[in-house]
Amino acid sequence: MVTGVIQAGSTLGIMLPPSVVLVLYGMIARQPVGQLWLAGVGPGFLLAVLFIVYIVIRCHLQPHLGPPLALEERQQITWGEKVRLLRAGIIPLAIIFSMTGLFVIGATSMVESSAIGALAATLVAWGKGRINIRVLNDVLRKSLGVSCMFMWIILAALAFGAVFDGLGAVHAIEVLFLEKWGLEPWHVLVLMQLTYLLMGTFLDDTAMLIIVAPLYIPLIISLGFDPIWYGVLYVITCQIAYITPPFGYNLFLMRAMAPKEITLLDIYKSIIPFVMIMIVGLVLVIVFPEIATWLPERVYGKR
């Protein structure tokens, strides 16, 4: 149960703001990042609620999977410790809001939000006495390296997409699927999601974006689907692929971090219920697109 909860819960990070995956998708798909972030909130909380409901029901039926903390141990936790734990989460939330909140409400641009977030984190580290010239130099070097990496990733994806556009690949695939094979647009969408599930077992989200996004996103738009909504579907499918046996990306990371007595088979068994739940969540977002589109439409208006 514990390994399943850790793996399933960790996948929610790429759905909720400030999701780097949605930022990359927005840049490659030329879609507004603010709307993508807001579109991920509804499905992200939906998956979280589905996880919680499953855990509560499962632990109620099998109490040994999640025994409650002993009364003696709970009494040892003072109100002062609870307040300190609560205060520890306020600063990270404030930093996150300084990046995402100001950008979503239109007070800052994406670049300005990044600078504000970096400045806020630096000030917090300085206030706690955890920063010096050596640390600052190391952070700047690593930040520059990551920024350059993402620049080349986006450049490669855009160049890849331009080549496909120039060759007419999107139109050719549309003709193949819709006219020669007689498929409906929804059939094409399901096939796309299945390819993401397959590739996600051995590739990360960035690699998949570079390989297929330049081809899939123009096709999605030509089929009449909302690219904002599709970005959320892409992220959910990545989440499922990461934890799908036998080659899920996160499964082997969990095996590397878990105690030796927890086998790979145990990890496989623990994650299967959560994979099923995430598939249910994906189907719900496909059938009811408003789960993803309602919030950005309320904030920014209909596109």
Which stretches of residues belong to each language-model region?
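Alpha-helical transmembrane segments of multi-pass membrane transport proteins
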Residues: M1-R303
